[in-house]
Regions:
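Active-site-proximal beta-strand elements of phosphoester/diester hydrolases
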Residues: 3-20, 24, 52, 175-183, ...
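Conserved beta-strand and immediately adjacent loop positions that scaffold enzyme active sites
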Residues: 7, 116-118, 165, 235, ...
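Cys-nucleophile CN-hydrolase/nitrilase-fold catalytic domain and related Cys-dependent amidase chemistry
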Residues: 36-133, 140, 207-222, 226-227
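Short beta-strand scaffold segments in enzyme catalytic cores
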Residues: 102-103, 117-121, 167-169, 254-256, ...
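C-terminal beta-strand edge segments of enzyme domains
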Residues: 235-350
Length: 350
């Protein structure tokens, strides 16, 4: 493994909403053109070894926006990993000589008519070397199944260890993990990655109003600082829906944050396709972890104390073990409102 610094490139694409799996080809064509320029320009100082595609780059957010039937989306829009789409991305990995981190709504062979939100990593040979199944989809609008929604069967298939929920790929360019989009709104997911060895975390995409409020940047920087790891957070530029409306629902603020919480590369604007770059210095990260007496916080976790916070369940496990994910209004009524009441009943909220 080389510890020489290298460049990471995050694409900031314009996304076209899909209505069928075949429509992904339109986004792939755009992404490839953007990647060619981004890798060429991004590598002028140091070689590009990591290429990052934001969540939604392949399929858009059709299910969230249109409150689609889950099983129908699984059959018509979700992909298989590996499959033709990841094969295409794999050809780019070989073309550019890079690792690629990306995302797709994808099926799982053990869960018919269901799809998960999957972050994945391709190595420079084009092989899929990591799949991360999103643990905390965006409530109440995202219909992706979480491993927690089918927890009993998931643990039968994958076990209960960190690799079942926060897998990390140990690669020549560092240990790569995924906490996409809303997952990073929960510090526990970043900590799960860090405790499984993650050094470089994929965190993208995030919508308005959470970007304009500052939440996106606060979370990115805090997760990096708390866990002494890089956070890669390119945000999409614009979105064209099936009705033809082109709009920026994301608000820019694409960034790559280093292991001490400083944004190294940043593009503030949205609206037009571009890219963000930064230097990844693994040697500096590992030195910080190995020599700091204070700010390598993870070494000081008093885990016996924190375990007491999790003895009582909060969000219900196995919510979709026997049914498809709920539509927006039903989710609000059957999940969101009871969860708020639970916090009050326990005396946590007033």
């Amino acid at each position: 493994m080389t510890l020489d610094p290298y460049t990471a490139v995050g694409l900031i694409p314009e996304i076209t909403e899909i209505r069928h799996r075949d429509d992904i080809a339109t986004n792939l064509e755009h992404l490839h053109k953007l990647a060619r320029t981004a890798v060429a320009m991004g590598g002028l100082d140091l070689p590009v070894k990591l290429l990052v595609l934001p969540e939604g780059s392949l399929q858009g957010f059709t299910d969230e926006i249109h409150d689609l039937d889950h099983a129908t989306y699984a059959r018509t829009c979700a992909i298989d990993i590996p499959g033709p789409e990841t094969d295409e991305l794999g050809s780019w990995a070989r073309e550019f000589g890079v690792h690629i981190m990306a995302q797709a709504k994808a099926r799982h062979p053990e869960f018919p008519d269901r799809y998960f939100n999957v972050g994945f990593v391709l190595d420079p040979s084009g092989d899929v070397i990591l799949r991360h199944y999103k643990l905390t989809p965006l409530p109440p609008i995202e219909h992706s199944v979480s491993p927690h929604d089918v927890l009993d069967l998931w643990t039968q298939l994958h076990g209960r260890g960190p690799d079942a929920f926060w897998p990390v790929a140990d690669t020549p360019i560092g240990r790569l993990g995924v906490m996409m989009a809303n997952e990073a709104s929960y510090p526990e997911n970043a900590r799960g990655l860090a405790l499984n060895g993650c050094e470089i975390a994929y965190r993208t995409s995030f919508p308005l109003p959470g970007v304009a409020s500052g939440a996106f940047e606060i979370q990115n920087r805090a997760r990096a600082l708390d866990n002494t790891m890089y956070v890669l957070a390119p945000n999409p530029a614009a979105y064209t829906g099936s009705d033809g409306l082109r709009a920026d629902f994301f608000g820019g603020q694409s960034m790559i944050v280093n292991h001490v919480g400083h944004p190294l590369g940043r593009v503030n604007h949205g609206g037009i396709a571009t890219f963000v770059t930064a230097t990844i210095d693994l040697a500096a990260l590992r030195r910080q972890r190995a020599t700091s007496a204070w700010t390598n916080w993870t070494k000081d976790l008093r885990t016996e104390l924190y375990q007491t916070l999790c003895e009582e369940p909060i969000y219900p496990a196995n919510l979709y073990a026997d049914r498809a994910p709920l539509h927006h209004a039903a989710y609000r009524q059957q999940v969101t409102e009871p969860q708020i009441e639970l916090m009050r009943t326990r005396g946590i909220w007033r």
